[in-house]
Regions:
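Surface-exposed short loop/turn segments
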Residues: 34-38, 45-91, 99-110, 114, ...
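A structural "domain/chain start" motif
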Residues: 1-26, 30, 35-37, 42, ...
């Protein structure tokens, strides 16, 4: 294995975060650049990692006695298709999700960037471990 293709992450979630796909793409490319000797190519790599964001949701997770949300949770879900052109038995098709909780009295806008950064870190680690960490 000498090359990997990591195309731009597709965003298919209903709720929109305009920077998430780009940030996740950059983080994945950086992780593979730092921790592997694989050369990143635009197409036809020995390995290919296709990622799509399938969910971006905020839900209340803790309710107070007066039925107000005390904590909210931002969850990001992704689906990956990892193709190993030399060893197809190592192909991976899997879904991952990661979340972060935040104080429900805060607006999502005020905490979203920091939450997404942490969530992206978790997702990238999970994806890396599921695809090439066993080498």
């Amino acid at each position: 294995m000498k090359t990997i293709t990591i195309p731009y992450v597709e965003y298919k979630a209903l709720r929109v975060n305009p920077s998430l796909a780009g940030d996740l793409t950059d983080a994945l490319q950086e992780k593979f650049r730092k921790l592997t000797r694989l050369e990143q190519v635009d197409e036809e790599g020995d390995l290919e990692l296709v990622v799509e964001v399938t969910g971006y949701d905020v839900k209340a997770t803790a309710i107070t006695a007066d039925e107000q949300a005390a904590q909210s949770r931002l969850t990001v879900s992704v689906k990956i298709e990892f193709t190993n052109r030399k060893y197809p038995e190592d192909d991976v098709s899997q879904s991952f999700s990661a979340y972060e909780d935040f104080d429900a009295t805060l607006s999502l806008d005020s905490v979203e960037a920091g939450l997404c950064e942490t969530i992206i870190d978790k997702l990238v680690e999970d994806i890396f471990n599921a695809t090439v960490a066993q080498w």
